[in-house]
Amino acid sequence: MLNPIILFLAIIFDRIIGELPESIHPTVWIGKLIAFLENIFKSTNCKNKYRDFLFGSLTTFITLLVVGVIAFFVDKCIMLLPFPLNYIIYGFLLSTTIGYKSLFEFCKKPIEYIKNGDLEGARKAVQHIVSRDASKLDKEHVLSAAVESLSENITDSIIGALFYAIFFGLPGAFVYRAINTLDAMIGYKNEKYLWYGKLAARLDDIANFIPSRIAGILLIITAPFYKGDVKKAIYGFLKEANKVPSPNSGYTMATLANALNITLEKIGYYKLGSGKIDVEKSLNAFKAVDYTVVVFLIIYTLIWWIT
């Protein structure tokens, strides 16, 4: 298992540096590879679902193979370097698979606009992080959308990559990020991608199955630290997670909504928790994420030390 020092370094690098420029960001390179392959294996828009599934699966397989092989060799080369240089470089590269700082930046913007009384600015800001039409959302639903995005991405942006890095090093983290990117680019249930992106979407569900539930449990454990209600958090985890169409996102969304005693609602799709959402409670959600990450690292460090 990966030395916890590397995980701490990855978090520190991400929180200080944030996202790298697009020209040198590995996730952007992965996206370009996916787009290149998609241009070769074009979708037929469901006119031939078997062809779409085959070529979409090839796109997925080739992407994961290329990313995994490169990450494997980079991993081995780094570990040939002397300590502490190897740990520093390893931690830096691992940080590129994490979106901790950028997640906070994007999700806080709408809340800050609401705090300053600028509803229109908040709508525009939240539109960057959700797919629903935000142009007519009221204050509560803007706040809800921001916290939904934050809670949903605890797994995708932070815990998931760390989880796979622990067991599989850089290859695990980068393959996980590639799966997320594939799902984000071709994992849609529309005419073009229904069959072409089916494998990518299923792999994303599988990859997030364990990390999402770990994140949900950690939100329960850390609830007292962010003024959350433990009993309600447990209720959300056990009883409301399945209200969300995603098989994984609900475990963090429902747990956090109930812990903070707020309502997270995507009109016409789901309604989680109860109680009125406001700026203060919305900002508490960021504390919840911080405590979740810290406790995750502490627990893993103890396990690593004992074993």
Curated annotation (Swiss-Prot):
Q: What is this protein called?
A: Probable cobalamin biosynthesis protein CobD
Question: What are the annotated GO cellular component locations?
Answer: plasma membrane
Family, similarity comment: Belongs to the CobD/CbiB family.
- Membrane-related topology note: Multi-pass membrane protein
Could you tell me which PANTHER family the record lists for this protein? Answer: COBALAMIN BIOSYNTHESIS PROTEIN CBIB (PTHR34308:SF1)
Localization of this protein: Cell membrane
Q: Which cysteines are joined by disulfide bonds?
A: none
GO molecular function annotations of the record: ABC-type vitamin B12 transporter activity; threonine-phosphate decarboxylase activity
Q: Which residue ranges run through the membrane? A: 53-73, 78-98, 156-176, 206-226, 286-306
Q: Which organism is it from?
A: Methanocaldococcus jannaschii (strain ATCC 43067 / DSM 2661 / JAL-1 / JCM 10045 / NBRC 100440) (Methanococcus jannaschii)
Which UniProt keywords are present, listed alphabetically? Cell membrane, Cobalamin biosynthesis, Membrane, Transmembrane, Transmembrane helix
Pfam family, any one: CobD_Cbib
Record-level GO BP terms: cobalamin biosynthetic process
Cross-referenced NCBIfam families, in alphabetical order? cobal_cbiB, PRK01209.2-5
